[in-house]
Every structure is written in structure tokens, then in C-alpha cells.
Amino acid sequence: MKKILLIGLLVYFASQVNAQEYLFEFGTIRGLDALVTSESPEEVPIKWFDVNTGKDTWYFEGDDLVCKGLPIGVIRSEKQYQNFIMHIEWKHMEAGGNSGTFVWSSAVPGENRLPDGVEVQMLELDWVNQNKKDGVLPPIAYVHGELFGVGGVETIPDNPRGTRSKSIENRCLGKGEWNTYVVVCVDGVIKLSVNGKFVNGISQSTQRKGYICLESEGAPIHFRNLRITELPFGVVTDEQIAPLLN
């Protein structure tokens, strides 16, 4: 019985990977030279592929990429990234909304429909009020840019809350307001700037090259001004690289 269940799960996960199809372009990639020369940077659009959401989950309002929030799942970048700087702006449209991005991900969904990698959390401020346990509020740091490994990816938190790393300053804005994240990823180390200040980080990630994913997790969210600046490669082992997808 266990063998049959295992085979069924493998078939399911394989079907999720094979179902990935091109959706749209959103955001741009540029090289490091763009930061150190006076020339206008050559920017290449980023192509996105559906992993397990659906074409109707995502649409554009002007320059904003809007995610409806259902079904739960992710879309992924066309290519993998190792060392890079990611600038992304986001705003929730509902109180307590939940979303995020995954970096260094395999983009293969697990049983909870989400992939492995390091998650860069994006929660609306009222989330803590809506998720009390026995009348006790979760730590406010939940909603100000947590970082944590998921799906078997391990990290060392700069500011530990268990295995997660919490923000050391409350800087996120509430629903309807734009937040700016700058995520610097280099050789297994991630530093997160929230609205103009670095307030969180992790190190020694066991996965250091993979896809970038945008998350659909139950609530509408807007994204805009996604820019990725690629940095020079570092030394990684095969075990630290997510498998390539077709």
C-alpha cells in the first residue's frame, strides 16, 4: 500500500512539472556592468512559466502584475539564478493577505502545492490579528519580511525565530500601500532590505542556485518594477543546484 501511495505521489509531482507552460513576460534582467558604467543598461524581459496555478490566476493592470491568490501555487522564472540582486515592489489588497517569493527554488511543488527554496515572506500587517493561537498574537516580525528555507532547504538565520529569520525592524506598510524589497543573494547568503533599510538575512543555504518563483497563496496581491541584476558566479556543488526543468 505504501509503495502504491509513493508511486502515486511521484506521478502527481511529475505531472505538475510537465504541466509548466509559458505565461507572459514580467520584469527585466540586466548585468552587473549596468551598475558601474554610464551606458544605458541592456535589459532583457523575464519570461514566466506556470507551475501549478492557472492562466486565470494572473493578469495585468497597466504595469502591475496582479495575482488573484487562488489556486495556491507558484509561477517560475524561465532560467535559474545563482548570485543576483532582486528589486521587487508589492502591495496586498486584503487585510491579512499572504504571499511571497521563492529564490534558489526547484519550482517543483510539494504536498502543500509550494516548492522548495528560500521564501521571502510577504504578509499584510493584519495577518497577526487573524492568526491568534489561544488568544495570543504571533510575533509582529512575521509580517515584516521573514526569511526561511522550505521543502528541505536549510539556512542559518541572522535573527533567529526557530529556524526562520525575523526582521529586526518593523518596516512593511499595510493593504493598498506599496512595499519595496531588495533581495541580495550571494553564495548561500541572503540580505533583505525592506522599504530602504536592510533588516534581515540568512546564510549557509543548502541550495544556492535555482528558479525564482512568485507565490499565489489565497489573497490578491500586486507586483511591479521587478528588476534582477545578475552578479558573478560563485563556487557551488551539484548538490547545491536545483534540478533543471525542461
What does each of the following model-derived ranges do?
Residues 4-13:
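Sec-dependent N-terminal signal peptides
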Residues 13-19:
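Sec/Tat signal peptide C-region and signal peptidase I cleavage site
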Residues 20-246:
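Carbohydrate-interacting regions of secretory-pathway proteins
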